[in-house]
Amino acid sequence: MTYDLICVGAGPTGLACAMEAKRAGLRPLVVDKGCLCNSLFHYPANMLFFTTAEKMEIGGLPMAISADKPTRVEALKYYRKATEHYDLDLRLFETVEGLERANGAFRVRTRRENGAREEHHATRVIIASGYYDLPRPLGVPGESLPHVSHYFTEAHPFWRRQVVVIGAGNSAAEAALELFRAGACVTLVHRGERVKRTVKYWVLPDIENRIAAGEVKAEFNTLVTRIEPGQVVLRSTNGAAAAERLLPADFVFALTGYNPDFAFLRAQGIELDPQTQKPAVNPETLETNVPGLYVAGVVVGGQHTSEIFIENGRFHGKQIIASLH
C-alpha cells in the first residue's frame, strides 16, 4: 500500500498533520518509536500545562476539562480520544530507521519493537518527531552515572535525600518545588545569575520565594564541572581561577533542555543551518530542500526549541496540507 503521506511522530503535531490529511481526503499513516504522545507521557506525572485547553486542541475537536489549563493526564486522554475520533492508522513502538526517495515516492524503513523490519511507502513524508528524546548534554565527567537523570517524573522517592537540580527553566523550577514539597533537600545549580524570566508566571514567584526563604538552596553563577557518586563538583563562573567545591548529591537532575534529532534530519538529506540547526524549509509550505519531505512542530525551530509549542505547532499540518492542493 502506498499512503498519501507518512507522519513520523505521534505527538500532538504529528497527529494534527494526520487529521488535516484525513479531512482533506488523503490517506495518512503515523509512525512513532514510542507510545501515543510519547513525550507527554514522559512529562512529570503532576505537570500542569502552561497554555490553556483551547490552544492545545487539534482536528477541530474541543478539549473539555473543568479547569483552565489541562494536566498531563487530561491532555493524554484528550489526544487518545481525538485519535480514536479520526480513526488514524498508527504504527506505535516502531522506529523509523531511514527514508529513500525514488520515482517521486518515499520508502520508509522501520523496525518494530520485536526487531522485525518493515517498509511503508508514501508520496510525501512529514517529520514531526519532537525533541524530548535527546537531552542537551552537560558534557561533564560522571553525567552517565546511574544517579543522574535528564528527566524528572515525581518527587516521592527522593524524600529526605540530597538532590541537585541543574538548570533554571520551567522543568528545573517545577522539579525543585515538587522535590522540596515532598521533603527532599534540594539545591538548584545554574550558570546564570537568577531563575529564568521565562518560567511559568505562577511558578516563578513560588521558586523565588522558596529560594529567598532558604527552603530551596540555590547556587547561581555556578557550573557543575563533574559528577561523582554522592556529590557534584562546582565552580563559580565569577573568575577563571575560582576554586572548586563539593556539594552532596544522592541524586542529580540535569534539566538543561532537549534538542531535535539533527543527525536523523541530516541523514535524510535535509540541510541544516550551521549556527541554529534550523532545517532549510519553504516558510509557506514547510517543505524541506528534499522534494516531498516536510518538517513540522519543534523540529522547524532547530536549536531554538522555545519558539514552537503545541499551541503553534498544531497548525503546521494545515499549512502543509493546504500547500498540496
Residue spans for each PLM region:
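Active-site acidic short loop of glycosyltransferases
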Residues: 2-3, 121-123, 160, 229, ...
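FAD-site-proximal beta/loop scaffold in flavoenzymes
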Residues: 143-157, 258-307
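Predominantly flavin-linked oxidoreductase catalytic cores and closely associated redox partners
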Residues: 101-104, 115-188, 192-203
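A Rossmann-like FAD-binding core segment of flavoenzymes
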Residues: 87-122, 181-276
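Beta1-alpha1 glycine-rich phosphate/pyrophosphate-binding loop at the start
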Residues: 3, 10-88, 173-201, 273-275
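Glycine-rich, N-terminal phosphate-binding loop of Rossmann-like dinucleotide-binding domains
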Residues: 10, 129-130, 256-257
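A conserved FAD-binding loop/helix module that cradles the flavin
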Residues: 296-325
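Beta1/beta-strand and adjacent pyrophosphate-binding region of the FAD-binding site
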Residues: 1-13, 161-169
